[in-house]
Regions:
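Catalytic NTP-binding/metal-coordinating core of nucleotidyl cyclase/transferase enzymes
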Residues: 47-134
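Regulatory cytosolic signal-relay segments
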Residues: 1-56
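Acidic, glycine-rich loop-and-strand cores that form catalytic or ligand-binding grooves
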Residues: 137-144
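Signal for well-folded cores of large energy- and translation-related assemblies
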Residues: 93, 97, 180, 198-201
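Catalytic/regulatory signature loops of cyclic-dinucleotide turnover enzymes
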Residues: 170-172, 192-214
Length: 214
C-alpha cells in the first residue's frame, strides 16, 4: 500500500503554515545545523552504551538529499529557504514514518533512515528482505510526494524553483558507537553501506533511485 499523498499534503501544509506565521512575527536568521534527530539507533540507547563502544548490526539504509541546495538557497534567500525546508523535510519524514523507518540523522537537506536491526527482527520479524522492501518503497513514494506535495506547495507559495532529490538504498552491516564527551555526545553509525547509499543519492539520475542489496 502506497502512502496517502493527500494526508501528507495536509500535514505538510499545516506544518508550513506554522513556520510561515513565525516568519511574519519576527526577522529570521538562517543557521545551518547538522544535529542528529536523536541519540538512539534502533536497539542501541545512548545511556546504556559506553564511550568508544563497538557493536555491529545489519540495517537497510536510505539516504535522500536535495540537489543543488546551496545554489538554490543563494537564489531564493534565507526566508524562502527556511520555508522550503519546512515543506521538504516534513513531507519526506511523513513518508519514512509511514514505512516505519527510523530517522537517524538530518544533515542540512539530507536525511538518513534505517530499517531492520536486531530489535526490529525480534519485535516485528523485519528480516533483510522486508527491511530492503520497506526502504525501497519509501524511496519510491518520496518521488511521488516530491512532485505532488513538495513542489505543489513550493509553486503555490512562490518559494523558488522545483525541488529535485536523489535517493540511495543499501543493506549491510554498520558499526554503532557512542562518541563524544559527557553531556555532549551522540550515537553514530558507520559503514560502507552508509557511504554507498549517500554516494548513490548524490549521483543517481533525476526521478530515479538506486537500491544496492549486499
Amino acid at each position: 500500500m502506497a502512502v496517502d499523498v493527500d494526508e501528507i499534503y495536509k500535514s505538510t501544509w499545516e506544518h508550513y503554515q506554522k513556520a510561515k506565521s513565525n516568519v511574519i512575527k519576527k526577522d529570521f536568521v538562517l543557521e545551518h545545523r547538522a544535529d542528529a534527530i536523536s541519540d538512539i539507533i534502533p536497539g542501541f540507547e545512548a545511556d546504556k552504551l559506553e564511550f568508544g563502544s563497538y557493536d555491529k548490526e545489519n540495517f537497510a539504509v536510505l539516504f535522500v538529499d536535495m540537489r543543488d541546495s546551496t545554489l538554490r538557497a543563494q537564489n531564493v534567500g534565507a526566508e524562502k529557504t527556511f520555508l522550503t525546508m519546512h515543506v521538504y523535510l516534513t513531507a519526506l519524514l511523513e513518508v519514512i514514518k509511514f514505512y516505519h523507518g527510523k530517522v537517524i540523522d538530518i544533515m542540512g537537506d539530507g536525511i538518513m533512515a534505517f530499517w531492520g536491526g536486531r530489535a526490529a527482527r525480534e519485535e516485528e520479524n523485519m528480516v533483510k528482505a522486508i527491511a530492503v522492501k520497506k526502504a525501497g518503497l519509501c524511496g519510491r513514494d518520496m518521488l511521488a510526494v516530491r512532485e505532488k506535495v513538495i513542489n505543489e506547495i513550493i509553486d503555490k507559495e512562490d518559494l523558488g524553483a522545483p525541488i529535485n532529490i536523489g535517493i540511495g538504498v543499501t543493506f549491510d552491516s554498520v558499526i554503532v558507537t557512542k562518541i563524544g564527551i559527557p553531556n555532549s555526545y551522540d550515537v553514530k553509525a558507520f559503514g560502507d553501506c552508509i557511504n554507498v547509499a549517500s554516494k548513490y543519492s548524490s549521483k543517481v539520475s533525476l526521478d530515479n533511485f538506486v537500491i544496492v542489496s549486499i
